[in-house]
Amino acid sequence: GVDKAKTMTELCDRQTGAVKKLIVSQNGALRGIFVARDNATKVSATDGLDADVFTALAKAQQMAEWSTTDLYAPLFFILEGRGYTGTTLKDLSNETYNRVGVLLGDTEADSQGACVGTLAGRLASLPVQRNIGRVKNGALKTTLLYVGKKKVEEDSEVISSIHDKGYIIARKYVGRSGYFFADDRLACVETDDYAHLSNRRVIDKAYRIAYNTLLDMMLDELEINSDGTMQTGVITSWQQTVENAINRSMTAAGELSAGNNGEGCSCYIDPKQNVVATSKVEMTLKVRPFGYARYVDVNLGFQVTTV
């Protein structure tokens, strides 16, 4: 088990944290890690939340980047937004933590924690490209949600402000019963390619497929030209193999946006690289994500025929 006295910052420390041991023990199987603490633990609030949340952000980002670069096992973190005080929250929308999200709100009033299990369950039920706030997903499986002492529906301006500051938060829609996540923001600038959990999960899945596909080619013999470059047939074969793997696993499953050719990715190997000299093959892989209707503006008026 995990020592309940440990802070989230300590748990996520890349050198000594228990999370690192968990990642290694699972041999790359983990796609996302949700970190929460016992509600009985003491909270020391600053900038609207337990200070531990903000110090854990950098640690979680470092851990996720280490897992990606060293283990070829990309993943994301969701941190529990503990100890919400109702005062001005720190703005996460200017940060750089594009592998970490912070969840606010709980199923109990004035709770020190957040409904991490609700978010984890919703994510587990969705394909990687799907936004957790998609209305067609249906309402969350909870009858009440609170932010601090108030129900979510009692202060829509506060909910909007929390969302704008880069937190994951639930909301209500007029005319619909139940609660929905407002969006899937991660703790970084909105212009980051991976500012949203859906894009993060898509690119991470493509990464894993490419890694697994290319691993079969490790230390394989390569037909080369007299200048040490790869022969055209070899390059074409490698590119097609990677594209086929991703298109079969993701594009065909509706997880990538297909182009006119029916493909959702493209792979390119520079034919000028001298593989004999470097023993390295460099490749560029691009995948096509979906767009999301975060705002829908309607110009509405009467249709009148003038006689």
Language-model features: locations:
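Generic structural hydrophobic/aromatic packing signal, biased to beta-strands
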Residues: 1, 33, 77, 102, ...
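Compositionally biased, low-complexity/repeat regions
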Residues: 5-9, 259-307
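Long, contiguous, structured domain-core segments that constitute the functional module of a protein
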Residues: 119-237, 241, 284-307
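Small-residue-rich
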Residues: 1-87
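Residue-level marker of positions within ordered structural domains that often coincide
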Residues: 38, 247, 290
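Catalytic cores of large soluble enzymes that bind and process phosphate-bearing ligands
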Residues: 48-55, 198, 230, 234, ...
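Long, internal scaffold/assembly segments composed of regular secondary structure
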Residues: 84-145
